[in-house]
Amino acid sequence: MARSCVTDPRWRELVALYRYDWIAAADVLFGKTPTWQQDEIIESTQQDGSWTSVTSGHGTGKSDMTSIIAILFIMFFPGARVILVANKRQQVLDGIFKYIKSNWATAVSRFPWLSKYFILTETSFFEVTGKGVWTILIKSCRPGNEEALAGEHADHLLYIIDEASGVSDKAFSVITGALTGKDNRILLLSQPTRPSGYFYDSHHRLAIRPGNPDGLFTAIILNSEESPLVDAKFIRAKLAEYGGRDNPMYMIKVRGEFPKSQDGFLLGRDEVERATRRKVKIAKGWGWVACVDVAGGTGRDKSVINIMMVSGQRNKRRVINYRMLEYTDVTETQLAAKIFAECNPERFPNITIAIDGDGLGKSTADLMYERYGITVQRIRWGKKMHSREDKSLYFDMRAFANIQAAEAVKSGRMRLDKGAATIEEASKIPVGINSAGQWKVMSKEDMKKKLNLHSPDHWDTYCFAMLANYVPQDEVLSVEDEAQVDEALAWLNE
């Protein structure tokens, strides 16, 4: 029969030395010297009955140090329970639990006898005589499943809530309702993605501070700018990407602060009007792009063709409106004919035609190929972004395109047409940051229902231009080249 670690004098010596000195324990057991920021988390969490809430930017090492906290709590307190909570179970496995595995490997290499008493599996960590009781567990708190968090009780209990900003108030009600013991602790960790909810309150009305000495939480901010683990090059890159320290995304993902304002309109009217008068210098290798928004649904009654000069990619993209065409009450067949007539490659060499690829836009795109042999680029901006980084920043391609277009306006890389419709639409695009920390543009249905705003057909074409690929207008294409372009576009449109 397995013996408990409490019978081993070596374990008792570790407890005597490090139960209340986790900073030293991190060094001795795991070979990790915590940064001054990580020290703050450790010093708060190692206190009996502590309630700690941490906002953090990228790269501060919070997941690594949290894994060490979880292991030490289990090691030093007989019968202890650590509950790792997140909206998705896989989120914990990919984050904190990954570090538990690597740090535990270091600990047993330094103190091999520990492996006799503590068992690590793919999804749990427990004392050999206390499986299911003296243990680290993972629980999901996805909406509708909050009651699964109930039933946790122990003399020494630690809840660790990952990405806490996205956890529902109902889940927190269940969790905090279990913290009835003298040494029941809670540690919240997250980027500060939304200015509401329990996690937000833990840094404001529930936080211990000079004006609120009876608050519940020790609130800690980990700013990536101040972390010795974050290279200055990363900070410079994020400043350039987000456009300044006060940009909401920079505040959330770098400074670890709740943004001053995250909901409102994408652009102000003065910014839009300046963009109609601005002189934008196009880069070498620019190409012609015609973006088409097809009327249909959500109160729309106009189709728009926007012919533009385009150069560069992403935050280097420059866009100059050349011609804006608007049509009322035209059929898909009529619109396809107008696109073919207006986007003449003899006048606009190598012009790329991009059409919204859903709804009636799909029919128009099909007609362009069936009647005129033209393969258009279909904009499917309801789809998700491709890279992990982009997925973390943008809810979908529509959000990416709108944010990129707005940044182009603000930084002087886009010239808009002077039409009243464009000015009105561009200055009334409702945008915000959701609980996952992603930019999200209000749906067109909600724009109409909540704000009585019509579909921004003209502005949408400028957003399409941030997604469209183009061919330099002075590039000579052979028949084989054109076939390759058509093949590539067909692949993109799948």
Swiss-Prot record:
One function term, GO molecular function aspect: endonuclease activity
Motif interval(s): Walker B motif: 158-163
Cofactor binding remark: Binds 2 Mg(2+) ions per subunit.
Residue positions of motif Walker A motif: 56-63
Binding-site residues, Mg(2+) 1: 293, 446
InterPro entries (alphabetical): P-loop_NTPase (IPR027417)
Residues of the active site: 163
Binding annotation for Mg(2+) 2: 293, 356
Superkingdom, taxonomy of origin: Viruses
Binding sites annotated in the UniProt record for ATP: 26-33
Entry EC number(s): 3.1.-.-
Keyword vocabulary terms for this entry: ATP-binding, Endonuclease, Hydrolase, Magnesium, Metal-binding, Nuclease, Nucleotide-binding, Viral genome packaging, Viral release from host cell
Named cofactor requirement(s): Mg(2+)
Subunit structure: Interacts with pacA protein.
Assigned protein family: Belongs to the punalikevirus large terminase family.
Function: Component of the molecular motor that translocates genomic DNA in empty capsid during DNA packaging. Heterooligomerize with small terminase protein to be docked on capsid portal protein. Forms a ring-like structure through which genomic DNA is translocated into the capsid. May have or induce an endonuclease activity to cleave the genome concatemer after encapsidation.
Protein name: Probable terminase, large subunit
Species assigned in the record: Escherichia phage P1 (Bacteriophage P1)
Biological classification of the source: Viruses, Duplodnaviria, Heunggongvirae, Uroviricota, Caudoviricetes
UniProt gene name: pacB
